[in-house]
Amino acid sequence: MSTTGHRAGVFKKPAKPHKSWKGKRTKGEITTENRGREGVKQLTRSAHSTHRAVSKDARRNQLKMARDRKMADAMERRRTSNAPCLVTILSLGVGARPSEFLKKLATCDETIVQTHSPSTIDFAIPRFKSRISFLTPDKENVDSVLDAIRASDVLCFLWPLSAELSEWDEQLLTICKAAGLPTIVSVVPGLGGIQNHKKKEDVRKGIEFTISKWSMSNAGVMPADSVTDNLQLLRTLNETKKKPLTLQARHSYMLVENLEATESPEDSSKITLKAQGYLRGPEWNANNLIHLPGFGDFQISKIETAADPHPLKTSPPKGAEVIAKADEKRQSLETEITLDAMDGEQTWPTQEELEEADKEMRRVPKGTSSYQAAWILDDSEDDEDEEDEDEDMDDEEEDKDLEEDDEEEDTPMDLKSEAGETTASEMMFHDEIDEDINLAEVEKYRKERENAQWPDEVDTPIDQPARIRFQKYRGLKSFRTSTWDAKENLPVDYARIFQFANYKNTKKNVMSKIGGNDVDAGDAVIDKKFNGVFASVYIENVPVSVMEAYKETKNLVLFQLLPHEQKMSILNMVLKKHPSCTVPIGSEDQKFIFYVGFRQFEAHAVLSSNTPGDKFKLERFMPTEKTFVATVYAPITFNPATVLCFRQDDKGRQELVATGSVLDTNPDRIVLKRTVLSGHPYKINRRAVVVRYMFFNREDIDWFKPVELYTPSGRRGHIKEAVGTHGHMKCRFDQQLNAQDSVMLNLYKRVFPVWDYSLFNRNLNPSRFVERSRVESISLVQEDAMEE
């Protein structure tokens, strides 16, 4: 008998390993693996819960019914949405011009009927029984590109063979990605003309690598050189699965192809617009308001059908038919609550008191005449006085270091003389530097660096009691757990805004009525069969400037508002600073240009930390690495919605500052501004410490006695009593202090945004995102490269 054991052969298949991870998949992984298929367990779960046995044939029938239901829904969407597929052509790098690309595309089939409108180039393709409308915006005009993308079903990129993008192309892609992209098709003109197969594959892989780097599409690239390539491209544009933007799925919209105006009977300065185009998106509701970018919200009187200018088949013309008409239930144009001047029974100030309050007060050195005082730049004093009126001002005006001599020598006169010497040196510095240096930006860099080294630290004023200077501040035992009443000491502007009792429930109710599901709308909602038809929308009481702007640009996209979206409230947006912006952005001195969904407006924002909790710390400067929340007065916008944040420089150009999305509409968000007062340990006796330079009189020490002290090394303590009359105080800590420690005291005050919301009309505020000379040089380089 052999003593050796059995050994499996080399062709023996090993046993299957135990899949321990199989039962630990997440719901997302299971959904991805199923790819839309409904499992038997999911279908029979309700049957098992009611103790009803389901046969195998019944389960198969349920799966078949689910498939048929999905196919019927898809056919219904295709049947009712008979508007032409809207495609935006965007050329990147040294690629083909969109006009030349469309000329070649139109010659691939003799049956294509090409028509033109002021904003589109339309193809009627009998071979595919479909229509395609092309938009060719100027890529140097960001507003035109964004408008085209918001209205498009497909975005077609024309990539260069070198796969190299200019700096402007990369910035444009960043802006477009942040604003949201529809279905993407990537085309490479000239790819089919490369005869060498290896070189052709290298070019293809290089372009696909660039596309994957931008995380835009994994469908590969398509050539567009031969007739076969162009036919295949048209088929792809027509039959590819369209993934609508959230903006398109929620809001009815129209790309205006014709605009006419008639005078309003009520007001001669107003007109009634007749906007013609295809009805896109969910079913239109004549009771909802409509938004004209840059001009505001307006009411619709009626919607009627019109003759299609780009028909697939010629048919006898039909008369106009009213398909929706506004009634008494239509949305109001009220944006804010009207304040009652007598509300609260507050006595109105007299004219003498108003004049006295308007007088400008300045602190000047002793002996200064009134004529000299008129020339003193009082930025620091004005900032200090206005800080209690405008809560978003900075607290770092007095950053002079106190001399560590006898206490009696630290007088306000010494500080003022020191400030005078600083002003003289600054004047000499101004004379010596180059005029091209922006002194305001240099000052921002300095303040940002100081804030990074000593966050929120402010020197206690010597010539003013600290209890007066920081009278609107309070101490907190714990920033995380201490309570703060959100309805306490609200500004007057809070009486003008709207607030939801339950934001989530209101949003759920509004979203449930999208697409003609509102049973109370009556004749104001169009029938599903009219979705996608060419129609005329009549808009009432529109300013004449809208017509003038359209004549210049020939570019207008209309969006219908959801209920409540015309009302003003507090809008919170989660943003992240863009790497291309290297300038320090202060939270109080910069007015931003926001692109929120289809809205464009200007406003000052309060920047705060994006952290969990019910209280959030004010960010004095826009963070570079982490996300933050910008809070502004703005119309209500239901999340999710994309946000682009720009700033306007001294030359009138717009620079991308940050990108993000809408967080919520919540006026109860508590943003606290922290001010840190610091002192120096004068004498240390184990846990007992005498601290100086935090306060300069006995009354201030008694006033801030309840506030807890701490040190950067983590020690905690309290003020025990004042020592003398010049600001020394005896403190006690939980452990012994180090001689290099500083003693800190935190004070907090709630801040609110400033009500300065205004519509941003790019037609009235012409600005380029880059200098025109640079754009022309790029165009010349492209033309030379194409000729070579």
Swiss-Prot record:
Q: Where is the composition biased (Acidic residues)?
A: 378-412
The UniProt keyword set, sorted, is: Nucleus, Ribosome biogenesis
Protein localization: Nucleus, Nucleolus
Return the annotated region ranges for Disordered. 1-40, 354-433
Q: Which cellular components does GO assign to this protein?
A: nucleolus
Provide a Gene Ontology MF annotation, just one: U3 snoRNA binding
Checking Pfam families in the record gives: AARP2CN, RIBIOP_C, Tsr1_G-like
Q: Which SMART domains match?
A: AARP2CN, DUF663
**Domain Bms1-type G, which positions?**
83-243
Coiled coil location: none
Composition-biased stretches, type Basic and acidic residues, lie in 26-40
Subcellular location, principal:
nucleus
Keyword presence, Transcription: no
Q: Which GO terms describe its biological process?
A: endonucleolytic cleavage of tricistronic rRNA transcript (SSU-rRNA, 5.8S rRNA, LSU-rRNA); maturation of SSU-rRNA from tricistronic rRNA transcript (SSU-rRNA, 5.8S rRNA, LSU-rRNA)
PANTHER family listed in its UniProt record: PRE-RRNA-PROCESSING PROTEIN TSR1 HOMOLOG (PTHR12858:SF1), RIBOSOME BIOGENESIS PROTEIN (PTHR12858)
Which family is it part of? Belongs to the TRAFAC class translation factor GTPase superfamily. Bms1-like GTPase family. TSR1 subfamily.
| Protein name from the UniProt record | Pre-rRNA-processing protein TSR1 homolog
Organism the protein comes from: Caenorhabditis briggsae
